[in-house]
């Protein structure tokens, strides 16, 4: 089936699809507060979703494209779940978040199909994949339209990978007690086996969102990158996040000695946001398999145990947490009790000495991850490095931090 026909089949209207903001029914949703975070985006009045401009632009979407799609959503007069929130248009039609971003993606998909230059075609496919991923954002379980957009993001990513430099292999990992999962191994040019970074992404992202990290930061150093979806989304959708947060990544890590393209003696883990919870946990549980752990804006303790901290983050992020845990109908109190168990300090790990070298980067006044969170990680490591990232200029400092982290990891590979 052609990619165009797949799009038509997946998005063919069959019934009134549930609107994203209604899928998690927490009983005590609070009033949203203004918030700004480099890594997670801004909470802007009249939007349910966090508008994550930094990450979207970093992935290759232009500021103008973001504004154009937002404008189409704002201007829609279609029925909304909440008339106060622009991105709650009901049904797959003009003004609906998923519709507008998928429509943008389809234009790039069409360009990719018409482009004779394989490299340029690959770039267009990658752009389409990024846009489909934003369409599916924040990837809440049970959002049928978003899951269809995820499928298109993955298909477009596979098309892109066939045309872009280096090579990509899909690896299947068997997980005891459940369905296997699929990861993407990105390899630079040259002869393997390659030192490899195991990427642990945020709860609101797909594994296909990190190609730029591989291409611009790891590949130039001759480092491969393995991505795996977080539990409950993408290729890991049949798994629910539980207190053993690193379960899927740990099984993948243990399997790497059987992958001929990977130098399993030189593997590091890199975690964004909640992905840092997985990466740090692996640093404690698998020190013999990891040369280093790096984190950015980690969520490992404070947000998980402090109700005041939880009260400062937007509703969307709490909905994402509830969705990953399979708690779609829970009260905030029940969610708090459960989240407390996900703290690596509560689990008896953080605070104990860890032999694995650990770097943690943070932004001052980050509502998701205060400085103390990163200090807790680095002070627990026998070889810890704290990295403060100035907020402005946000894009340049983010790029500089990623280059520092890539060099630090490469140095730990020896």
Curated annotation (Swiss-Prot):
Keywords: Hydrolase, Serine esterase. It holds the Pfam family FrsA-like. It catalyses: a carboxylic ester + H2O = an alcohol + a carboxylate + H(+). InterPro entries: AB_hydrolase_fold (IPR029058), FrsA (IPR043423), FrsA-like (IPR010520), FrsA_esterase (IPR050261). Belongs to the FrsA family. Catalyzes the hydrolysis of esters. This is Esterase FrsA. The gene is frsA.
């Amino acid at each position: 089936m052609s990619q165009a026909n797949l799009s038509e089949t997946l998005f063919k209207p069959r019934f009134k699809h549930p609107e994203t903001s209604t899928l998690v029914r927490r009983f005590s949703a609070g009033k949203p507060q203004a918030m700004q975070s480099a890594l997670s985006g801004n909470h802007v009045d009249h939007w349910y979703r966090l508008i994550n401009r930094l990450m979207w632009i970093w992935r290759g979407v232009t500021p103008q494209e973001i504004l154009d799609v937002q404008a189409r959503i704002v201007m829609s007069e279609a029925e909304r779940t909440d008339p106060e929130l622009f991105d709650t248009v009901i049904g797959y039609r003009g003004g609906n978040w998923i519709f507008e971003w998928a429509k943008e993606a389809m234009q790039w998909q069409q360009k990719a199909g018409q482009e004779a230059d394989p490299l340029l075609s690959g770039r267009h496919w990658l752009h389409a994949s990024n846009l489909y991923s934003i369409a599916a954002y924040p990837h809440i379980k049970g959002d049928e339209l978003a899951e269809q957009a995820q499928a298109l993001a993955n298909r477009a990513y596979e098309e892109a990978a066939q045309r872009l430099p280096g090579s990509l292999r899909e690896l299947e990992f068997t997980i005891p007690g459940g369905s296997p999962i699929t990861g993407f191994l990105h390899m630079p040019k040259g002869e393997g086996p390659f030192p490899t970074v195991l990427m642990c992404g945020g709860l609101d992202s797909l594994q296909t969102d990190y190609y730029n990290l591989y291409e611009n930061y790891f590949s130039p150093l001759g480092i491969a990158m393995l991505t795996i979806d977080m539990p409950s989304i993408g290729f890991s959708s049949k798994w629910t996040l539980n207190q053993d947060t690193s379960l899927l990544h740990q099984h993948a890590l243990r399997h790497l000695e059987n992958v001929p393209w990977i130098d399993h003696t030189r593997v590091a883990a890199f975690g964004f946001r909640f992905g840092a919870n997985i990466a740090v946990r692996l640093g404690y549980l698998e020190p013999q398999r990891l040369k280093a752990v790096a984190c950015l804006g980690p969520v490992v303790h404070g947000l998980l145990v402090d109700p005041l901290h939880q009260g400062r983050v937007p509703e969307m992020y709490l909905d994402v947490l509830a969705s990953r845990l399979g708690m779609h109908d829970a009260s905030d109190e029940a969610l708090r009790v459960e989240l407390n168990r996900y703290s690596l300090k509560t689990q008896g790990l953080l605070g104990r000495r860890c032999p694995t070298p650990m770097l943690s980067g943070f932004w001052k006044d980050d509502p998701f991850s205060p400085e103390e969170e990163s200090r807790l990680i680095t002070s627990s490591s026998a070889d810890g490095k704290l990295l403060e990232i100035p907020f402005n200029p946000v894009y340049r400092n983010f790029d500089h931090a990623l280059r520092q982290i890539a060099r630090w990891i490469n140095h730990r590979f020896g």
